[in-house]
Amino acid sequence: MGLPRRAGDAAELRKSLKPLLEKRRRARINQSLSQLKGLILPLLGRENSNCSKLEKADVLEMTVRFLQELPASSWPTAAPLPCDSYREGYSACVARLARVLPACRVLEPAVSARLLEHLWRRAASATLDGGRAGDSSGPSAPAPAPASAPEPASAPVPSPPSPPCGPGLWRPW
């Protein structure tokens, strides 16, 4: 079967493929209904052997009934926004750093405490102002800093990049 040379050939080709496509579509529907029956019967407490002759409509009705009876809390929730994901990742990273940094003794304790205080403050400001952790022109909220954190010195620590709120959020991992 090459490319049709005339309009009549194309029509013939469509005519011959139509039953084949319909057969495949019906096979997919039947396979999906069979899988659905296999999934829904155990959840309803019925045995597969007793219900082998269920009609397609029965399987669909049982599925609809089962889904209607599910509590609303078990329904899947919407995916988090990229901004929320960024904030959660940033906070988790700072929390991990707060556990590791004092133990590895790479920095002096005062510098380490100042760095952690700054990072916690940035995480809190990103949460409070809806994800924009840009310039801190206003007062920031108290940050959950370590208990032994000394007062910050005058040397500023670079701030993390502000979380982008968009579909093209790039992640290094």
UniProtKB/Swiss-Prot annotation:
Annotated region (Disordered), positions in chain: 128-173
Domain Orange, first and last residues per copy: 86-119
Residue stretches of biased makeup (Pro residues): 141-166
Disulfide-bonded cysteines: none
UniProt protein name: Transcription factor HES-2
Molecular functions per Gene Ontology: DNA-binding transcription factor activity, RNA polymerase II-specific; DNA-binding transcription repressor activity, RNA polymerase II-specific; protein dimerization activity; RNA polymerase II cis-regulatory region sequence-specific DNA binding; sequence-specific double-stranded DNA binding
Cited function: Transcriptional repressor of genes that require a bHLH protein for their transcription.
One GO cellular component, as annotated: nucleus
Recorded domain comment: Has a particular type of basic domain (presence of a helix-interrupting proline) that binds to the N-box (CACNAG), rather than the canonical E-box (CANNTG).
GO biological process: regulation of neurogenesis
Cell compartments where the protein resides: Nucleus
Taxonomic source organism: Homo sapiens
Family matches, as PROSITE patterns: BHLH, ORANGE
Subunit field text: Transcription repression requires formation of a complex with a corepressor protein of the Groucho/TLE family.
Expression by tissue: Expressed in placenta, pancreatic cancer, colon cancer with RER, cervical cancer, and in head and neck tumors.
